[in-house]
């Protein structure tokens, strides 16, 4: 059997038991919830718009997000297997907000994140209601020194029609649009110092390429303070014999190491996942916290990450953060002004 054929067989076996995804939500219901109050900014590219909504303020948008998330993640080998991907993190009292990029010309939600100020996810008894707490053990230092000043990012997605592999023109700026939204959140929450979350890899990703990528992240973006670690029962180590590339990055700066990583991953028939690529090229001081299995979501693999906002490269700050003042005025971009 060829490479991946057994994984493909298992994937299709699982797919048989998945529910049919719901029909698209009516555009008029979505547009009615894209209010001035929910508007964050216009994007740097594509004349798209970024909004911040939640299940309680925009139930129809939330339903469409649930549909698009399931469509996107299921297509990549993950997903819930349900008719739409909405869980208690979206709907509970300490609910996440939904950061979305909207294409007004196509009338489509093209991409999204769910986000929460971590101090809003702690109840009166001190229990932490964060997605990452299901997979990672938080140190006391992290709880006291980092969590109160962090925004957690999760469930990042770009719907299939707007992925570069499907439509290069439309897909080119999909993730970039979301980062414009994150830039707005950084400005609007000046006490926030960190962006915290996890990046996903799917079980069908080549095992050697996966191990090389994790080895690279541990080498260039280590957690020297031992702030977080995967829960013991969910911890995922290396799957292959890493002695073939151990020491491969020793003595190399990040750019040199990245060239080797990119070349080797491509030789193994894969590409570095776009979101991981974005995070790695955002800040030199990013920290990674090991990899855990998400057994609630198609057994995808989650690697914890933390970015210090002050350390984000200036070129990225200029692009996503400093443009907020220019792009934040609702209605300032009419068709006439953008021609």
What are these regions (language model features)?
Residues 13-56:
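Conserved N-terminal entry element of GNAT/NAT acetyltransferase domains
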Residues 42-87, 97-114:
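Short amphipathic alpha-helix that is part of the acyltransferase structural core
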Residues 70, 80, 120-285:
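Acyl-donor binding region in acyl/amide transferases
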Residues 83-90, 97-102, 137-143, 184, ...:
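Catalytic micro-motifs at enzyme active sites that drive phosphoryl/nucleotidyl and oxygen chemistry
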Residues 90-100, 123, 286-287, 297-303, ...:
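A short helix-loop-beta-strand connector motif used in the catalytic cores of GNAT acetyltransferases and
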Residues 102-132:
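A contiguous, low-structure linker/loop signature
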Residues 274-281, 286-307:
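Aromatic sugar-binding interfaces of carbohydrate-active proteins
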Residues 298-339:
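C-terminal non-catalytic accessory extensions
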């Amino acid at each position: 059997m060829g490479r991946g054929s057994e994984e493909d067989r298992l994937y299709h076996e699982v797919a048989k038991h998945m529910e049919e995804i719901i029909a698209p939500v009516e555009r008029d219901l979505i547009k009615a919830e894209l209010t001035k109050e929910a508007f964050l900014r216009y994007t740097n590219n594509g004349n798209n718009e970024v909004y911040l909504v939640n299940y309680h303020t925009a139930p129809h948008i939330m339903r469409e997000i649930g549909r698009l998330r399931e469509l996107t993640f299921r297509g990549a080998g993950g997903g819930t297997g349900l008719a739409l991907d909405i869980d208690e993190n979206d709907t509970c009292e300490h609910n996440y907000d939904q950061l979305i990029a909207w294409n007004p010309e196509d009338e489509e939600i093209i991409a999204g994140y769910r986000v929460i100020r971590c101090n809003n996810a702690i109840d009166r008894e001190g229990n932490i209601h964060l997605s990452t707490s299901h997979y990672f053990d938080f140190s006391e230092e992290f709880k006291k020194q980092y969590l109160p000043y962090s925004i957690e990012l999760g469930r990042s997605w770009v719907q299939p029609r707007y992925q570069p592999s499907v439509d290069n023109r439309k897909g080119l700026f999909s993730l970039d649009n979301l980062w414009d939204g994150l830039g707005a959140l950084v400005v609007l929450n000046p006490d926030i110092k960190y962006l915290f979350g996890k990046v996903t890899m799917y079980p069908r990703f080549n095992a050697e390429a996966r191990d090389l990528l994790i080895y690279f992240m541990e080498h260039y973006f280590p957690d020297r303070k031992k702030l977080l670690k995967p829960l013991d029962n969910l911890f995922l180590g290396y799957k292959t014999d890493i002695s073939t590339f151990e020491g491969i990055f020793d003595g190399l700066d990040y750019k040199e190491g990245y060239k080797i990583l990119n070349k080797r991953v491509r030789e193994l028939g894969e590409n570095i996942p776009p979101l991981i690529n974005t995070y790695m090229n955002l800040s030199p001081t990013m920290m990674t916290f090991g990899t855990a299995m998400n057994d609630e979501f198609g057994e995808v693999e989650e690697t914890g990450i933390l970015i210090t906002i002050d350390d984000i490269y200036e070129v990225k700050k200029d692009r996503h953060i400093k443009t907020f003042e220019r792009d934040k005025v609702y209605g300032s971009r009419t068709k006439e002004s953008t021609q």
